[in-house]
Amino acid sequence: MGQKVNPHGFRLGITTDHVSHWFADSTKSGQRYKDFVREDIRIRQLMSTGMERAGIAKVEIERTRDRVRVDIHTARPGIVIGRRGAEADRIRGELEKLTGKQVQLNILEVKNPEMEAQLVAQGVAEQLTSRVAFRRAMKKAMQSAQRAGAKGIRIACSGRLGGAEMSRSEFYREGRVPLHTLRANIDYGFYEAKTTFGRIGVKVWIYKGDVTAKELAAQAASAPSRGPRSDRGGRPGGADRGDRRRRNDRPAADAAPAAEAPAVEAAPAAAEGGQA
C-alpha cells in the first residue's frame, strides 16, 4: 500500500495537512464544491505557467466568504515579487480576475530548497532537458539532499532515458525511505521533463525523520476543534439521571402504605367474625 499511494494523501492528518482550506455547502453556481476545486486547479496552473525559474514548491489556498488567500512557497521570492513588486501585482490582478474576489497574496521563502522534494524533482527535470545524463543528475541531487540533512532519498525517472527506443524506469536510493510508516515525515514531488525524445517523469521521495509524539500532540492542539460539548446530564425536562432515579423511587414508597391499608381494614372484620 505504501509503495503505491501518494505519500501526502496517505499521511493526511498525521504528518501532512491539506493545501486547500475552505468549505462549500452552497448550491449556487460558482460557489459549489466542484467550482472551488476547478478554481483551485486553475490557480495552481497559473502559478506554474511562466514561473518555472521561481522554484515554486507549494501553493496553499484558503477561502473566506469574500476573500481568497494564496500562499506561494518559493525558493526565489525575488523572481515572484519582481522589481518594486510589479510581478506580484500582476499575479494578484490575474488571480482577482480569475476568482472574482479580493485576493491576499503571500510570498514565503523556502529556507532549505535541497530538502523540498518538488524542487529537487524540478531541478533533475531541468538537467534532463539540458541533455545532462540522467544518472549524473540523479546522483548529484541525492548528494545535495543528504548534505542538507535528509535521512533518505529516492529518485525515479521514467521515459526514453538517454534517447533509447524503448522507455524504461530507473531509480536510485540512498538511506532509508520507509513509505509504509505513517509517522515517517516523507516529502514527495513530481515533475515532467520535456525533451526532444518525449517526456520523462521524475519522482522524488525525501525522508526527513519520524514525527515525535510531542510534535503530534502540538499538531493536535493546533487543529480546530468542534467546541465544548453540551452537558449530557442536563435533560430537556430539567432533570438529570439521578433525579429520574429518585423520582422513580417515590411511587414505590407511596405504594407501601397503600398495600398496608387493606390489612388494617381486614382486622376489624376478623374480630367481628370471632364475636359471631
Curated annotation (Swiss-Prot):
Biased composition (Low complexity): 218-227, 253-276
Alphabetical keyword list: Ribonucleoprotein, Ribosomal protein, RNA-binding, rRNA-binding
GO molecular function, one term: structural constituent of ribosome
Domain of life: Bacteria
Gene3D superfamilies for this protein: 3.30.300.20, Ribosomal protein S3, C-terminal domain
SUPFAM superfamilies assigned to the protein according to its UniProt record, in alphabetical order: Prokaryotic type KH domain (KH-domain type II), Ribosomal protein S3 C-terminal domain
Keyword Nucleotide-binding in record: no
InterPro entries the UniProt entry points to: KH_dom, KH_dom-like_a/b, KH_dom_type_2, KH_sf_prok-type, Ribosomal_S3_C_sf, Ribosomal_uS3_bac-typ, Ribosomal_uS3_C, Ribosomal_uS3_CS
Residue span, KH type-2 domain: 43-111
Pfam families xrefs: KH_2, Ribosomal_S3_C
Any one Gene Ontology cellular component term annotated for this protein: cytosolic small ribosomal subunit
Region (Disordered): 218-276
Biased composition (Basic and acidic residues): 228-243
UniProt-listed SMART domains: KH
Biological processes per GO annotation: translation
Family of this protein: Belongs to the universal ribosomal protein uS3 family.
Function: Binds the lower part of the 30S subunit head. Binds mRNA in the 70S ribosome, positioning it for translation.
NCBIfam families to which the protein is assigned, alphabetical: rpsC_bact
Oligomeric and partner information: Part of the 30S ribosomal subunit. Forms a tight complex with proteins S10 and S14.
Protein name: Small ribosomal subunit protein uS3
Organism: Pseudarthrobacter chlorophenolicus (strain ATCC 700700 / DSM 12829 / CIP 107037 / JCM 12360 / KCTC 9906 / NCIMB 13794 / A6)
Gene from which this protein is expressed: rpsC
